[in-house]
């Protein structure tokens, strides 16, 4: 049975035998009419996104320059300068620290799995983050705690950079080879639940998305992917990205924003899309966790992604 057939039967919960409504169901139907399966199918088809899932395994030996990977030393062009960030750690010690190298992606390799055709067709994409301070991302001052660099030159000119001497060993991720796959996704309830949506109940929504073939993720910290929708642990993050990008702290409820400002932020939040999600990274006796079983999420404006402008990416960290 296909996704449409499942959805077509989705809301027929109050049917009796032989498909006939019982007396209670008939009475309830007058008070509350659920959305049609056709409407749900049309909405899901319109909002679904493709994600590039990432599976990793220990590399064993150094990978060739330009290969997609997590950890190890980044393969960079001549003149590369390792990014640093000045911020406070968990003991409130403020200093300039080197960012941990997280991953690099050969976009020509990834492109096969980018079914929505939103990433550049070629080049290298590098991700860095201050793993020592683990900034949450909801403070405008956190800008720079994560960096995304793009290189579209000759891959043959790349070579492995040396780790900075002041980068602690616990943030030097062992090199991992990657395997990609494509999968379609729907947003988690926190991101879906906006005015005018077809479904107004989270349990009903999770049931419907499972029937559509996009069930919610049970353990987000085990998910690593490019694109798609974030596996939300706390709250929806696109509004936070837009708020912080305007220089507004959003670590608490903002009561001083006008209704018009809040409406504009909510509207502009639609411009933001997930670029990368990383959960806990582990290899034998190495483990790098974000908070307590959390994830880090890199978000980018759609127009910036089209323009290959990765200088305004925002990072968000969520954990349990």
Question: Which stretches of residues belong to each language-model region?
Answer:
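Preference for intrinsically disordered or flexible, low-complexity segments
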Residues: 3-11, 15-320
């Amino acid at each position: 049975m296909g996704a449409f057939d499942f959805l077509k039967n989705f809301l027929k919960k109050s049917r009796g035998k032989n498909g006939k409504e019982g007396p209670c169901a008939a009475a309830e139907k007058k008070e509350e009419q659920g959305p049609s399966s056709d409407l749900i199918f049309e909405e899901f088809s319109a909002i679904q996104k493709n994600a590039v899932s990432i599976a990793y395994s220990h590399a064993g030996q150094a990978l060739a320059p330009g290969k997609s990977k997590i950890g190890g030393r980044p393969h960079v062009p001549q003149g590369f300068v390792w990014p640093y960030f000045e911020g406070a750690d968990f003991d409130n010690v403020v200093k300039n620290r080197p960012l941990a190298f997280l991953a690099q992606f050969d976009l020509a390799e990834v492109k096969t799995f980018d079914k929505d055709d939103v990433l550049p067709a070629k080049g290298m994409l590098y991700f860095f983050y201050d793993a020592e301070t683990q900034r949450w991302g909801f403070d405008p001052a956190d800008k720079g705690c994560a960096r995304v660099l793009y290189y579209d030159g000759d891959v043959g000119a790349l070579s492995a950079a040396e780790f900075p001497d002041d980068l602690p060993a616990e943030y030097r991720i062992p090199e991992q080879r990657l395997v990609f796959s494509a999968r379609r996704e729907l947003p988690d309830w926190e991101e879906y639940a906006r005015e005018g949506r077809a479904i107004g109940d989270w349990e009903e929504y999770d049931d419907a998305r499972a029937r559509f073939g996009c069930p919610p993720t049970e353990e987000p910290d085990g998910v690593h992917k490019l694109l798609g929708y974030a596996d939300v642990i706390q709250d929806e993050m696109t509004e936070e990205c837009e708020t912080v990008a305007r220089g507004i702290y959003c670590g608490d409820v903002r009561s001083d924003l006008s209704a018009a400002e809040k409406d504009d932020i909510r509207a502009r939040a639609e411009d933001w899309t997930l670029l990368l999600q990383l959960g806990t990274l582990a290899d034998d006796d190495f483990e790098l966790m974000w908070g307590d079983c959390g994830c880090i999420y890199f978000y980018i404006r759609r127009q910036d992604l089209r323009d290959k402008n990765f200088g305004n990416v925002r990072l968000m960290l969520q954990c349990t």
